[in-house]
């Protein structure tokens, strides 16, 4: 079963949030799962929704009013959310359609006309804010975006990660960053600058990798691309001197992460900046007059999606390495069960990670492994814990859903393994 979290300390936090809402004239406050880069997986520093609710799933939106607290998530997490919200004031709201803003419908139904809903402008994109404003306006409800209430309440908030980045050699990338930059600039169509906020796109474009986000080899940063040069906004302490020199030779200067705001003001004072409304935060958008922004399509994703010859061959190598690790796990598990041992789901996951780590170029899991034995294999996004994981016997089915990050590429595999005789129903 999903690990329960302690909710005993959440009442004072909710009280503090409600007091801050009252002081700022807010009738409700939205806490999403995103970070300023709209990442699927976010660093601990941006896990405000998890910190406030105790729910550890990757997708969900919390809403707090003066008298109620709610969490919306999809069917992947219903069982987990029910367990982790138990004993708290938060009530689970089950999304009927994943990735939709059903919390806005609820706000329209339960808040009076003239109410104000607050949120953190860093965590909402331009398109999300526009959509929310339109929906709330139907009931004469205002959306107020410049409310950073969590910042003052989260006393032990983890700092932004400071893991060192490294360069992905061309032997793995198959294309130099200067060639990639040239390809992107050819698509800028007269826009003086183009702002890139997605962490995976920056990593691909610059041929760099990081370790700022669990299971994702990315570095928290922004990239402002000009006609002939580029500015990479990142904690400079994370960039080795040798990499800084290499970047500078390629026309890329390293700037402080927080410097993105001033750089946009300077560039936007005389030039236009291309952006994507579904990617850019309201916080950055509102730094400039609307006329200085130019809506563009995603210039990186189409290029990133087409694998070059080197990448294709490297993906085969990554899958081969992953296959070796999986076969070694099968052999280990087979021997363990034959000798009468009963390893736990958690131990199997740790063992698989260990076999992957033996492969050249491995630097982490691509997502937390899902190892579910018997009925646990039917729990969506099941996560085995060391103290509660089921013991595996030489019977029934074992689900393995896992992957690895290699310099060659990323893997994601799902296997269902029969550990003994199975019924005709299972075979079908």
Predicted regions and their residues:
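Active-site neighborhoods and metal-handling regions in enzymes and metal-associated proteins
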Residues: 1-428
């Amino acid at each position: 079963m999903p690990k329960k979290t302690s909710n005993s300390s959440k009442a004072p936090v909710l009280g503090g949030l409600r007091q801050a809402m009252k002081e700022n004239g807010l009738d409700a406050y939205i806490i999403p799962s995103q970070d300023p880069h709209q990442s699927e997986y976010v660093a601990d520093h941006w896990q405000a929704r998890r910190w406030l609710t105790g729910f550890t799933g990757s997708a969900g939106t919390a809403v707090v009013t003066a008298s109620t607290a709610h969490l919306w998530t999809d069917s992947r997490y219903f069982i987990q959310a029910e367990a982790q919200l138990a004993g708290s004031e938060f009530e689970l709201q089950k999304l009927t359609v994943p990735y939709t803003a059903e919390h806005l419908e609820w706000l329209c139904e339960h808040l009076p006309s003239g109410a104000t809903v607050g949120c953190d402008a860093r965590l909402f994109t331009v398109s999300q804010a526009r959509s929310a404003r339109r929906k709330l306006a139907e009931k004469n409800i205002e959306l107020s975006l410049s409310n950073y209430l969590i910042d003052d309440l989260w006393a032990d908030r983890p700092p932004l990660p400071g893991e060192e980045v490294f360069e992905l050699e061309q032997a793995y990338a198959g294309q130099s960053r200067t060639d990639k930059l040239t390809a992107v600039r050819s698509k800028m169509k007269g826009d003086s600058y183009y702002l890139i906020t997605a962490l995976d796109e920056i990593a691909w474009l610059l041929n760099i990798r990081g370790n700022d986000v669990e299971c994702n080899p990315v570095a928290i940063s922004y990239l402002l691309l000009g006609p002939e040069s580029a500015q990479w906004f990142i904690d400079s302490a994370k960039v080795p001197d040798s990499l800084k020199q290499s970047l500078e030779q390629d026309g890329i200067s390293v700037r402080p992460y927080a410097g993105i705001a001033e750089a946009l003001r300077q560039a936007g004072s005389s030039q236009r900046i291309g952006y994507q409304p579904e990617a850019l935060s309201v916080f950055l958008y509102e730094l400039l007059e609307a006329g200085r922004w130019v809506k563009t399509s995603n210039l990186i994703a189409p290029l990133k999606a087409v694998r070059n010859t080197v990448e294709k061959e490297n993906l085969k190598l990554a899958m081969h390495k992953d296959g070796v690790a999986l076969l070694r796990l099968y052999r280990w598990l087979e021997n363990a069960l034959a000798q009468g041992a009963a390893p736990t789901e958690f131990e199997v996951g740790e063992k698989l990670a260990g076999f992957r780590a033996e492969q050249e170029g491995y630097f982490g899991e691509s997502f937390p492994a899902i190892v579910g034995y018997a009925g646990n294999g039917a729990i969506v996004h099941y996560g085995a814990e060391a103290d509660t994981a089921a013991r595996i016997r030489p019977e029934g089915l074992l689900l393995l859903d896992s992957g690895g990050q290699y310099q060659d590429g990323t893997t994601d595999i799902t296997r269902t393994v029969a550990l003994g005789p199975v019924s005709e129903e299972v075979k079908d």
